[in-house]
Every structure is written in C-alpha cells, then in structure tokens.
C-alpha cells in the first residue's frame, strides 16, 4: 500500500484563503512530452515537470524500455539513443492511460511496438480505436489480442507512411499519438478534426524544437511532414491550466483574494468566463498572473463540457462543488465522458443538493455545506471534494488520495501556504481522529 493509499486529508473549512500560489507544469503535457522524447536519439531535457504519481509512473514505463532517465527537482533528462525493447510492461501501462500514447513514438523509432491497453481514471469508455485506425492508415499492421496491442510496419525499412487521417472525434490522445508517429514517417500526414487543446500544441512545439515539421497545431487540421531523425532539445512545458482552474475555484468558493502566477490566461478563457458569469472578479495582473477577488454573491449558471476551446471536462467536478453554494438552480451537462458525475453523491454527503440523470447534474444551491467523511472516486472528483471541504463548516475527511496525487503537485501544501486548515494524515480514517487530537489542533496548523 502506498502512502497516498493509507492517507486521508482532513480539512477544517470555512476559512478564507489569502496569498500567492505558483502553478506547476501541466500534467497532461508532461506525460505525452516524456513519450515524445522517445522520438529523439539524443538528449532531451524537460523542464517545469510537476511532482506527480502519474509522472513517476510514466518514467517507470520509459525506463522499462531500456531508456536512460534521470530526474532532479522539476527537470527530467531522457536519452533514448538506444531503446532496448519495444514491449512496454503490462503492470505499468494498465495503471496509466497516457503511457499508451507512446506507441506512436515507439513504432516510429523501431517499426514495431507492443503496448498493453491503458488504464487510469475509471471515468467511462475511452477506447483506442482512433489510435489504431490512424496507425493502420500510416501502413502499420495492428492487432489487439488478450488486452495487448501489437503493431509493426511491414517491409525492410520499417518506416510509417504519411496519410490523410480524419478523426471521428477530436480525441486528444489519438491526435498526440498520431502526431508523434508522423514526425518520422515517410511523407506528409494530415490530421483532420484534430484536438485543439493547449497540451497538443505543447507537444507539437516540443517536437518542432527537436526538428519536426508540424503546422497547424491548435487548429482542427494538423499537417506533419516526416523527417529522418530528430535532435536533442531543452524544453520547458506549459503551466497546468486545470490546476490553475482548481485554485481559482477554491478562491471563489471560499470568498478569497489570491494571486496565481505561472499561468496562461488564454488557456483559461472558458473557465474565467463562467467564473465572471456567476459573479467572481478576476483580474489579469500580467501576462502570466491572475488575481481573484471575493464575490458577494455566487449566482447559478449552466455548463456544457466540450473539447477545447469549450469548457473543459476536467473542470466539471471542481465547478460543480462551487455551484453547490450558488444562489439558484444550475444544470451541468457532461458531454465528453460518460460516468463522470460520481462525485455528486459525495458532495451530497456534505449537504449539497444535486440530482443526477444520465450525464446531466441538476444542482440546487444551498446556504452552507457541512463537513463529513467522503471518498474521491477519480482525480477531478477528489479535487472537487477538497474544494467543497474548504468551504464546508466543520471537518471534512477525504479518502482516495491516490487519485488526487496522480494530478496535483502537493495541493495540500499549496493550500496550507494560502492559509487553509488542511492536514494529510498517514493513518486509516478510524485512527486519524486520534492522531490529530494527540498531535495537532486545527488552530495550530501552519499557515
């Protein structure tokens, strides 16, 4: 059992936050850029890498391929001059969905790849059929048997061929997988209906910094002209827009004034628009700094999650927590993933009034939330419970921290620095009360 598995978060809510928080590097950029480093036969230095369980796991996957990888603070160095095996380890890939995306880079480098089907958060079906069909269009033979995806490029050269590929849906993972595969392919690849997320653009910029020929990233049509090889690079990834959004929502629900640095406001346009819509004031202090001011009244609103540049599905759960205390009735429609509203029942344990029908949540605002024991069911659901706990009267105890640690870089420490009364306790919930009573009181938590 890991530390996160045996830990709980205890939050004494009802306290405003104050101060400054620096946003970490983007989780979803870090994972795929680490996979992208497999395209390069030289040294890749990746900066601004967040300290996350998922990043550690991705490093284990890459190391298992025989690739040299070292980490110091927020810098990861990868040298894939020699990839000793094309077979990724089952026990690691099945725990981390993003590790499957490395199949494009491995296939491009070696002409063969064996990748178990992916794991990650249990938030509905996220098949890899778009990845497979795209690789097949580029000349790969792909078979899936017993949960293992086997791919190879027939012929003596073992090089993928450029192709025109239309994605049925703008899948981020498929766009990234096929873009990586195309960087070393023979000829031109055109991805139509491609994902437009900032992390896709970040991966494209990383590959371009290594010498790839990519145009159109950030639009629905991406054109890649394959090159024979890529060279060494020193690259810094973008800030995490979902972490930034989570702290903005935490500030809003606690009626706080906080400042966020290392952000890209352009990546937060749909979220900022919704926050302003419900009465929150957000000021752009500088090109990479935002300040949120307390709202007198939070108003209800409706949300439809959409692929970028729409409202991000990863902010749906945190924003639902915020709307539990808004005046009036809100409707949240989750249109990106099914089975991503399980946090509603846990928020109701805290006194929220949420009714779920299919992929739609109906949220009726309540005057206050009350602390209670709750369980995080996935990464963003866990963040929603933290946000609700910050506003709830009394103590909230959150289990399931292994989800939270997959995607947030020391969120409890950052919240403590903003004045939150929050503790991570390395004991089962039944014993946590004793530990807190014996060792620390809410008033003595460092702020």
From Swiss-Prot:
InterPro entries for the chain: Enolpyruvate_Tfrase_dom, Enolpyruvate_Tfrase_sf, MurA_subfamily, RNA3'P_cycl/enolpyr_Trfase_a/b, UDP_GlcNAc_COvinyl_MurA
Enzyme class: transferase
Residues binding phosphoenolpyruvate: 27-28
Residues involved in UDP-N-acetyl-alpha-D-glucosamine binding: 97, 126-130, 314, 336
Keyword Cell division belongs to the record: yes
Stored CDD domains: UdpNAET (cd01555)
Organism: Nostoc sp. (strain PCC 7120 / SAG 25.82 / UTEX 2576)
Single GO term (MF): UDP-N-acetylglucosamine 1-carboxyvinyltransferase activity
Active site: 121
Keywords from the named record: Cell cycle, Cell division, Cell shape, Cell wall biogenesis/degradation, Cytoplasm, Peptidoglycan synthesis, Pyruvate, Transferase
Family (UniProt): Belongs to the EPSP synthase family. MurA subfamily.
Pfam family, one: EPSP_synthase
Major localization listed first in the record, in broad terms: cytoplasm
Catalytic activity of the protein: phosphoenolpyruvate + UDP-N-acetyl-alpha-D-glucosamine = UDP-N-acetyl-3-O-(1-carboxyvinyl)-alpha-D-glucosamine + phosphate
Gene giving rise to this polypeptide: murA
Record EC number: 2.5.1.7
Entry protein name: UDP-N-acetylglucosamine 1-carboxyvinyltransferase
GO cellular component: cytoplasm
GO biological process: cell division; cell wall organization; peptidoglycan biosynthetic process; regulation of cell shape; UDP-N-acetylgalactosamine biosynthetic process
Function: Cell wall formation. Adds enolpyruvyl to UDP-N-acetylglucosamine.
Localization per record: Cytoplasm
């Amino acid at each position: 059992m890991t530390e996160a598995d045996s830990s709980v978060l205890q939050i004494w809510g009802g306290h405003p936050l104050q101060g400054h928080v620096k946003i970490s590097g983007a989780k979803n950029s870090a994972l795929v850029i680490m996979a992208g480093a497999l395209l390069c036969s030289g040294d890749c230095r990746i900066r601004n890498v967040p300290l996350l369980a998922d990043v550690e796991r991705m490093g284990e996957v890459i190391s298992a391929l025989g690739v040299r990888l070292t980490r110091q603070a927020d810098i990861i160095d990868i040298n894939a001059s020699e990839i000793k095996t094309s077979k990724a380890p089952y026990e690691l890939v099945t725990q981390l969905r993003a590790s499957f995306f490395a199949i494009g880079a491995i296939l491009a480098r070696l002409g063969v790849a064996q990748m178990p089907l992916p794991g990650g958060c249990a938030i509905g079906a996220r098949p890899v059929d778009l990845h497979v069909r795209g690789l097949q269009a580029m000349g790969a033979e792909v078979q899936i048997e017993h949960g293992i995806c086997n791919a190879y490029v027939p012929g003596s050269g073992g090089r993928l061929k450029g192709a025109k590929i239309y994605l049925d849906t703008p899948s981020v993972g498929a766009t990234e997988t096929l873009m990586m595969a195309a960087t070393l392919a023979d000829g031109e690849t055109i991805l139509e209906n491609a994902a437009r997320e900032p992390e896709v653009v970040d991966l494209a910029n990383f590959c371009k910094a290594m010498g790839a020929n990519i145009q159109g990233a950030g639009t629905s049509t991406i054109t890649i002209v394959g090159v024979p090889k890529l060279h060494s690079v020193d690259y810094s990834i973008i800030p995490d827009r979902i972490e930034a959004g989570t702290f903005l929502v935490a500030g809003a629900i606690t009626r706080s004034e906080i400042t966020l640095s290392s952000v890209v406001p352009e990546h937060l346009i749909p979220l900022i628009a919704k926050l302003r819509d419900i009465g929150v004031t957000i000021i752009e202090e500088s090109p990479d700094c935002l300040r949120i001011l307390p709202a007198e009244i939070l108003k209800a609103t409706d949300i439809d999650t959409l692929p970028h540049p729409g409202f991000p599905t990863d902010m749906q759960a945190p924003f639902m927590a915020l709307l539990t205390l808004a005046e009036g009735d809100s409707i949240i429609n989750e249109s990106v993933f099914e089975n991503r509203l399980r946090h509603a029942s846990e928020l109701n344990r805290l006194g929220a009034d949420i009714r779920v029908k299919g992929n739609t949540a109906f949220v009726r605002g309540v005057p206050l939330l009350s602390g209670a024991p709750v369980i995080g069911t996935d990464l963003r659901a866990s963040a929603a419970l933290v946000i609700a706990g910050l506003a709830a009267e009394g103590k909230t105890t959150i289990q399931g921290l292994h989800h939270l640690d997959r995607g947030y870089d020391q969120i409890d420490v950052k919240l403590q620095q903003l004045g939150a009364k929050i503790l991570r306790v390395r004991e089962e919930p039944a014993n946590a009360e004793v530990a807190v009573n014996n060792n620390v009181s809410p008033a003595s938590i460092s702020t």
